[in-house]
């Protein structure tokens, strides 16, 4: 139905006909904090501490299924961030400066996790790294940049992640579109979801 299409030049008023409850109508007319039919007068941020000690790793698994199972295992671990990068996204940035040479030789099904953990002290970080490593011991790796505390190496690893969208967009075939929508899956369906998206 044409009125369901995303419209970036106007305001969709479908909520006036799609909903009967006044609260539903009003909440579907609100557009973030842009002031459309309302504004945000107060915001409460729940922040997380920026700990001085941190370590970052790039762990490459043989396939998306193993990678996703490892991501599930990390769910209960003291990690601050876990980003999944499939082979296509890794290929798009493999020629960037500072990346390991082995990235060119990864298998077609390779899938990586960029993992970061942070702690209030070096001793706490050591304990966290031991826990994280133990949780991943049963997942075979194809390659890795092991956990490093070196800020320069960490920045290079995060540059991989940050560079994937523009790089993927640059190498896509003419006439195709890059979709930058977030997708979510229940953690127990992550592997199947990622595999089906590929």
Give the positions of each predicted feature:
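Noncatalytic alpha-helical scaffold of FAD-dependent oxidoreductases
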Residues: 1-198
């Amino acid at each position: 139905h044409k009125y369901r299409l995303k419209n970036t030049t106007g305001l969709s008023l479908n909520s006036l006909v799609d909903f009967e409850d006044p609260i539903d109508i009003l909440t579907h007319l609100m557009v973030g904090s842009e002031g459309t039919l309302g504004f945000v007068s107060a915001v409460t941020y729940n922040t997380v501490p920026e700990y001085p000690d941190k370590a970052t790793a790039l762990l490459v698994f043989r396939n998306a299924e193993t990678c996703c199972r490892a991501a599930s295992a990390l769910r209960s671990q003291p990690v601050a961030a876990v980003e999944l990068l499939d082979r296509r996204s890794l290929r798009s940035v493999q020629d960037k400066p500072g990346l390991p040479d082995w990235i060119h030789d990864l298998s077609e099904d390779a899938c990586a996790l960029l993992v970061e953990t942070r702690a209030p002290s070096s001793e706490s970080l050591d304990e966290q790294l031991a826990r994280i490593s133990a949780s991943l011991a049963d997942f075979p790796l194809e390659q890795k940049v092991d956990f490093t505390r070196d800020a320069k190496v960490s920045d290079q690893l995060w540059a991989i992640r940050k560079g994937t969208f523009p790089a993927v967009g640059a190498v896509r075939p003419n006439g195709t579109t890059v979709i930058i929508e977030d997708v979510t899956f229940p953690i127990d369906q992550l592997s199947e979801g990622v595999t089906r998206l590929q």
